[in-house]
Amino acid sequence: VLSPADKTNVKAAWGKVGGHGGEYGAEALERMFLSFPTTKTYFPHFDLSHGSAQVKGHGKKVADALTNAVAHVDDMPHALSALSDLHAHKLRVDPVNFKLLSHCLLVTLAAHLPAEFTPAVHASLDKFLASVSTVLTSKYR
């Protein structure tokens, strides 16, 4: 459960992402594909090379979903319901992959926002991404 301090940290950190969300989302996806090659199996129709328009497009979708989650941090299950349905029923993404992408997002944010990425912010973002992952996998049951 996110504390009020966690919510403040997440909103402040995500606010610093600004217009770079799509770029950071794409970078996190590239990190995931390189570090965890089995995740590529969910994107057989994508050009997964560095700078690919498809990876950039999906990175923007990831960032937009996280922006939505930040904006609705007190009601993420409702805000992410359609996305949860999509990943559970149509795409059938293995839930472990959300943890892998979350890790890669944390690394990407730490690399781009070193001054803002304090231990407290790191912990808050980790809890937030774990909450998002929980919501996205809730329809698997």
Swiss-Prot record:
GO cellular component term, pick one: hemoglobin complex
Source domain of life: Eukaryota
Pfam family, one: Globin
Keywords, sorted A to Z: Acetylation, Heme, Iron, Metal-binding, Oxygen transport, Phosphoprotein, Transport
SUPFAM superfamilies: Globin-like (SSF46458)
Start and end residues of each Globin domain: 1-141
Entry binding sites for O2: 58
Record's keyword annotation contains Acyltransferase: no
Modified residues (N6-succinyllysine): 7, 11, 16, 40
Annotated positions of the N6-acetyllysine modification: 16
Tissues expressing the protein: Red blood cells.
Residues carrying Phosphoserine: 3, 35, 49, 102, 124, 131, 138
UniProt keyword Heme present: yes
Positions that bind heme b: 87
UniProt name for this protein: Hemoglobin subunit alpha
Protein source organism: Semnopithecus entellus (Northern plains gray langur)
